[in-house]
Amino acid sequence: RFIIQEGERVTKYYIHMNDSYHIIEPDYEWCDVYGCVNANFTHCPKEKYPKLVSLAPSFGIRYETNFLKAAINTMVTLSSVWKSVLRKSEWNKATQKNECNKKRNIKHFFTRRYKAWKNRLPLSAYDNEIKSEDDYVFFLSTLWYSDEWNQNDKTVNLRRAHYVRVCKSIPGVTFEGGLLGDAFSSNQLFADVYTDKRETFANWLEKTKRSAFVFNTPAFWNCHGWKLGEFLALGKCIISTPLSNDLPHPLEHGVNIHFVEENELSIREAVEYILAHPDYRHKLELGARDYWEKWGTPLASLNLLEIRN
């Protein structure tokens, strides 16, 4: 939540970063503009939710090169917001005391934010000056736990496994990566694509830049995976299964993305075609970066929310 005041005009904004497209009704009622990175106008039509604005997939960036400065800025902001909440809320004193004690846990606060700050990179790191390699493919992704509700083993896990198997089977291609899981997501169906080799984020980014192409598919609860935003920012040739949610502007097959069906044969045909047509690959790379600059950058997101300098 945030508020912008220009003269006497006050506009309240809420940014919905969740995996689900479901509108959070209390936040929708509170705000004037409801930005959502997983907007779905089929299930949440504009007629019912006129304040809903579709935003491009997001990912974390390091916005300060100095952690202490970043932490101080965050503390000042949170302090201001918290004072306002305490002053205006109708909570009882006991609740206020418990919540204040949580906020005073400075060690926990700094530990979490230092990890986030350390593991991410500035937006400038996505200005990709590394040329993609013709015969190198890197893909490292999550093998999600699956249950009767999310059924990830029949959707996102299976589609990612199809892609890894295809890339590993093509002669002349050096494939690196696989699916990372844990005790909750282990499944013998994916034993052949499982890896326990983790990468630092900096290494992941460098290897993704080198990769001939990348693979995207709707992730947990069919959300836009955060990697889709990163792939666009990096200007990668993206192979993708159909998207479940909306975007600020549709991606176009053959222009800024290569769409495939959700089966191994369709993925194989796409991989083989792109490997054989480097000019087409380069076209998709340029198209992806162009899409990002028009619809995905922080400035583009502000424009979508109609926030002007």
Regions found by a protein language model. Name each.
Residues 1-222, 243-249:
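Nucleotide-sugar donor-binding catalytic core of glycosyltransferases
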Residues 189-193, 204-308:
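Catalytic binding pocket for nucleotide-activated donors in carbohydrate/polymer assembly enzymes
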